[in-house]
Curated annotation (Swiss-Prot):
Entry EC number(s): 4.3.2.1
Protein location: Cytoplasm
Protein family membership: Belongs to the lyase 1 family. Argininosuccinate lyase subfamily.
Pfam entry (one): Lyase_1
Gene3D superfamilies linked: Fumarase/aspartase (C-terminal domain), Fumarase/aspartase (Central domain), Fumarase/aspartase (N-terminal domain)
Pathway: Amino-acid biosynthesis; L-arginine biosynthesis; L-arginine from L-ornithine and carbamoyl phosphate: step 3/3
EC main group: lyase
Catalytic reaction list: 2-(N(omega)-L-arginino)succinate = fumarate + L-arginine
GO cellular component terms listed in the entry, alphabetical order: cytosol
Keywords: Amino-acid biosynthesis, Arginine biosynthesis, Cytoplasm, Lyase
The protein's name: Argininosuccinate lyase
Keyword Cytoplasm found: yes
Gene Ontology BP, a term: arginine biosynthetic process via ornithine
Length: 487
């Protein structure tokens, strides 16, 4: 079949070219956005007197038929159509004959695909915010339930300081809150209509870009027609937003994987979100979080691929731009499914609170609190750090933990350690009331002492939960102010 653009060619394109050149297999998901753009465009052509009433009614009727066919999944796509834009135009001509050929008056596929993508990106950004809000809600609820579920906190994957599960989980709330805010910022920035920019230099027809902008629902438009069709920074930014979400999901997935091992034994995944082994009958594998972790590289890879494609292109439009869609669509699908699965995993997993608390009493995670206390008594913190470091060494040599030390052992240890200190610090350490230090050696009491803003003490955590609720409510209300481009 002849191409709609084939007037200056004497040969049909090679079959391999058709296969290589076509994007219809993946850009067909833009069909309703493309139809919206065409409806707004043809209405503007009529309002500006570029087409007459009869043509306008015929074209609009044809576009409505195609919309219904698409809804019923009856529209057929062929490689020879190249892309969704040509496919729709070809179908319109089949339905309405010669009048269908007037649809593309004063328009290029360059501004056509740009407006399709901007509407698509705006709508998907808000959909993703809603998915993030679902995860934030689950995390917030978990945190509220576990303000006093004590556990070790980690640095370098080594037990570091005591905290609570509520405090630990709430850190993900704030990561996702920033991801959601970033998407809303993106939605505002993408609120630009490129329609009417033509191939890149506008058009000589008396069009009204303001009319199509308002009909479609954009609040702004690209001020430069070349910029409108030659830019893919919005696609790039959107994939960055997706990458950030996946990176945060991956870090959460990594912890769920670790916590579900017998070595940690902090959680158990629900059977509905785990798999077995083909050879080892006892296995319960965390395949879902592992795949979330694994798919993160795929999304970040798409970001790198598009940035690399985009970086060296001259103005204005280049066919290379077609490469933005497959990676973007794949990234979007990956993030949407990962967010849905994560909220389900978090809301169904079993939390082994006793094991978490037990782990607190198997290490020296309260060492910092002891050093802090010594500093409050007048010993310079760096000396206090050294004192507690030597105390840890003493305990390890005698196969003991802090809470197992007696008052007498602590007195003897401090006197031995004091010899390495300056005179003032020696005096303070040897006269120290060791009963108070023994009291600090309880990791749970250490948690309650950490009451600075953002810390895990119950009072501080309750305040943070209140702040989280405010941000959650604000985001929820913001999302309601955005309308989908699709009816």
């Amino acid at each position: 079949m002849s191409k709609l653009w084939g007037g200056r060619f004497s040969k049909q394109t090679d079959q391999l070219v058709d296969e290589f050149n076509a994007s219809i297999e993946f850009d067909n998901r833009l069909i309703f956005y493309d139809l919206l753009g065409s409806q707004a465009h043809v209405k503007m052509l009529f309002q500006q007197g570029i087409i007459d009433t009869t043509d306008y009614k015929q074209i609009t009727e044809g576009l409505d038929i195609i919309w219904k066919e698409a809804e019923q999944d009856k529209l057929e796509f062929n490689l020879s159509d190249e892309d969704i834009h040509m496919s729709i135009e070809k179908r319109l001509i089949e339905l309405k004959g010669e009048v269908g050929k007037k649809l593309h008056t004063a328009r290029s596929r360059n501004d056509q695909v740009a407006v399709d993508m901007n509407m698509f990106l705006c709508d998907k950004a808000i959909k993703l915010v809603n998915e993030l809000l679902q995860n934030m809600s689950v995390i917030k609820e978990l945190s509220e339930q576990h303000t006093k579920t004590y556990m070790p906190g980690y640095t370098h994957l080594q037990r570091a300081q005591p905290t609570t599960l509520g405090h630990h989980m709430l850190n993900y709330f704030w990561k996702f809150q920033r991801d959601a805010s970033r998407l809303i910022d993106f939605r505002n920035r993408a609120d630009l209509s490129p329609l009417g920019s033509g191939a890149f230099a506008g058009t000589g027809f008396n069009i009204s870009r303001r009319s199509t902008r308002k009909d479609l629902g954009f609040t702004q438009q690209f001020e430069n027609s070349m910029d409108a069709v030659s830019s893919r920074d919005l696609s790039l930014e959107f994939i960055f937003c997706l990458s950030s979400i996946m990176i945060n999901l991956s870090r959460l997935a990594e912890e769920l994987i670790l916590w579900s091992t017998k070595e940690f034994d902090f959680i158990e995944l629900d059977d509905a979100f785990a798999t077995g082994s083909s050879i080892m009958p006892q296995k319960k594998n965390p395949d879902v979080p592992e795949l979330i972790r694994g798919k993160t590289g795929r999304v970040v890879g798409h970001l790198t691929a598009l940035a690399t494609t985009y970086k060296g292109l001259p103005m204005a439009y280049n066919k290379d731009f077609q490469e933005d869609k497959e990676g973007l669509f794949d990234s979007l699908d990956t993030v949407e499914s990962s967010l849905k699965l994560t909220s389900k995993i978090l809301s169904t997993m079993t939390i082994k609170t006793k094991n978490m608390e037990k782990a607190l009493y198997q290490d020296f995670s309260n060492a910092t609190d002891i050093a802090d206390y010594l500093a409050t008594q007048g010993i310079p913190f760096r000396d206090a750090h050294a004192v507690v470091g030597q105390l840890v060494k003493h305990c390890q040599e005698h196969n003991k933990l802090f809470y197992q030390l007696t008052e007498q052992e602590l007195d003897i240890s401090f006197k031995q350690i004091a010899d390495s200190l300056e005179e003032n610090s020696q005096q303070i350490l040897t006269q120290m009331d060791t009963t108070k230090i023994l009291n600090i050696m309880d990791p749970i009491k250490c948690v309650h002492n950490r009451n600075s803003r953002g810390a895990p003490a119950p009072e501080a955590l309750q305040f943070q939960l209140g702040q989280a609720q405010k941000y959650f409510h604000s985001l929820t209300e913001q999302v309601k102010t955005y309308q989908s481009f699709l009816p």
